[in-house]
Amino acid sequence: MNNLLKPSFYISEIKSALNLLNRHSGSYSDWSEAASNSQSYQNEKIIDQIKSAALVAKTENKYFRDGVVFENFQYSSELNNLISTAYIKNCLPFGIDRQLKILDYGGGMGSQHLQFRQHLNNFGINFNYSWEVVEQDIIANFGKKNIATKYLKFSSIKDFDFKKENYDIVVLGATLQYLENPFEILDKILEKKPSYIYIDRTPFWKGHTNEICILKCNKFIPGSYPTWIFSLRNFFNYFKYKYTLKINFNSEEGNFFFSKYRNGVYRGMIWYKD
């Protein structure tokens, strides 16, 4: 572990702090073209910083996300309320042995679970649930060895089988935009008919096409990533015959520009199965 980069900073609880320094640029005809101009998670320095932040957060009981350690926990009230609702509806009628199952696809080192676990601790409550993070090999393997708990487990995207398990909630936080074929993944998720799908920190714009560009991260999180900017109209049309929109909201990252004349906003939404 000596080769890990120790985060030399903490940032306080300021909304949109990460996104203010991020930049979207370019317009690419396909994913491979954008990927060839990006560093992505394959950059060893980025991976090391993510690992180091996760270990610091675990040791010091702090919140972390995207390789950044925060001074204060960043709670997701929409997600935490959803989990409570799902447990009451899906589990309580069947007794304490019924486990609420949550799939966190592309969930990094489990920061969403970390804030949820702290949320439970704040109120001195607990219930029977499992939280599975699915990530690329290098993240999943590290998580299994260093971050996993009784409630939190990690699986590799390469080995993950959508058909193997049924989930009550699927969490997609800052995930879909970084997948080469996001709607193929959504198709597989919807085939399993989870009760709820939680989407957050995802970029949308009002145009009619899904755009591909590059997200250049800030100086604290070096690197760049190919990313989708989804057409909000097309996205809603994809879901509307399969699920019902429960709520949609603006994410903390807020507004952004991805060309001189085009802008978008990071949004979140919760869909439920009737």
Predicted regions and their residues:
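Conserved beta-strand signature within the Rossmann-like core of class I S-adenosyl-L-methionine
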Residues: 193-207
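Short conserved loop adjoining the S-adenosyl-L-methionine
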Residues: 161-165
